[in-house]
Amino acid sequence: MTIINGKTKLLGVIGDPIGHTLSPPMHNAAIDALGLNYVYLPLPIAPENLETAIAGLSAIDLEGFSVTIPHKLAIIPLLSQITEKARLVGAVNTVWRTETGWQGTNTDVDGFLAPLKSLDKDWSQVNPVILGNGGAARAVVVACAQLGCGEIHVVGRNQKKLDPFKESWANTSLYDLLEVHSWDELEGLVSTTELLINSTPIGMSPQGEQSPVELELLDLLPPSAIAYDLIYNPRPTKFLRLARTRGIRIIDGLEMLVNQGAIALEIWLGQPVPVSVMREALLKQF
C-alpha cells in the first residue's frame, strides 16, 4: 500500500454526490501494483463551487482527475482544451494538466469499445440498436461510429427529446449514420441487429428486477447477437440474465467501467497500467 508523504502526487474524482464512486479502489490498486507514489482521492464538489474548485485543484498541483455527475458538461468551459472525442460526446470525464492549462477528454468511448474490439465481427455489417437517448447514449453512438458500424439506431420513450438528440450531430459525420426511433418501433429493429445496448438506468440497483426489454423481444435477436448493458450493479442485470437464457453473448458495464478508468490512468501516468488488477479491485466492491 502506498505510504503518503511529501512527494506523493495527487489524482482524484470530482462529483456530487461522490460517496458511491468505485474509482478510488480501482485506481489505487493499479497505482500500488506499479509501485508509484500517487494517490487517487474522492473530491466532493457541489455544482455552485465547481469553478472555484477547478482553480483550487490547479493551485495545489493536482496531476489530473476524473469527472462524474453532475459536472461532465459544466466543466467544459473551465478547460483550456478538449479533444474531438469529448466534443462529439458533449461531455468530459477525464482531465489532465498541460502547459496551457487543463485538457479534457472522454474515455467512455474507448472504454465501451474495449470488450468489443476483441471479437471477430465485421462491424460494418452491424447496425447497433441503443436503448435510451441520454448522456450515456451519446458516448455509445460515438463509439459505434468509431467501430465502423453501419446504421446506428437510437430508441427513446420521449419523442420530444429524440429529434434534438439527432440534430445535436447535424454538423458531424455521425449525422447520416444515426436514426432515432420511438419505443414502439423497437420490435421491428431488434430482429435485424447483432448489437443491442442498454444505456438507460432501467435495471440498476436497487431496481435490479427491472429490464428495459422483456424476453419476447430478446427472442427476436439473431443467435449471433450481443447484449451489452452499461449498468454494472447488479451483475448481471435482469436484461443480461434474460439474454443469456437465449444463448446470447452478454457484456456488462463493469468492462466499460474498468477500461475507461484504465485509459484515464494511462493518460495521467504516461505508462501502461494493469487492467486485470483494476478489474479485480472492482469485483471486490460487490
Swiss-Prot record:
GO terms under cellular component: cytosol
Origin: domain of life: Bacteria
Listed GO MF terms: NADP binding; shikimate 3-dehydrogenase (NADP+) activity
Pfam families from the UniProt entry: SDH_C, Shikimate_dh_N
Pathway this chain belongs to: Metabolic intermediate biosynthesis; chorismate biosynthesis; chorismate from D-erythrose 4-phosphate and phosphoenolpyruvate: step 4/7
InterPro entries attached to this UniProt entry: Aminoacid_DH-like_N_sf, NAD(P)-bd_dom_sf, SDH_C, Shikimate_DH, Shikimate_DH-bd_N, Shikimate_DH_fam
Root EC class: oxidoreductase
Residues the record lists as binding NADP(+): 84, 132-136, 230, 253
Classification via SUPFAM superfamilies: Aminoacid dehydrogenase-like, N-terminal domain (SSF53223), NAD(P)-binding Rossmann-fold domains (SSF51735)
EC number: 1.1.1.25
Residues binding shikimate: 21-23, 68, 93, 108, 232
Keywords noted in UniProt: Amino-acid biosynthesis, Aromatic amino acid biosynthesis, NADP, Oxidoreductase
PANTHER family attached to this UniProt entry: BIFUNCTIONAL 3-DEHYDROQUINATE DEHYDRATASE_SHIKIMATE DEHYDROGENASE, CHLOROPLASTIC, SHIKIMATE DEHYDROGENASE
Known partners and oligomeric status: Homodimer.
Name this polypeptide is given: Shikimate dehydrogenase (NADP(+))
Organism this protein belongs to: Microcystis aeruginosa (strain NIES-843 / IAM M-2473)
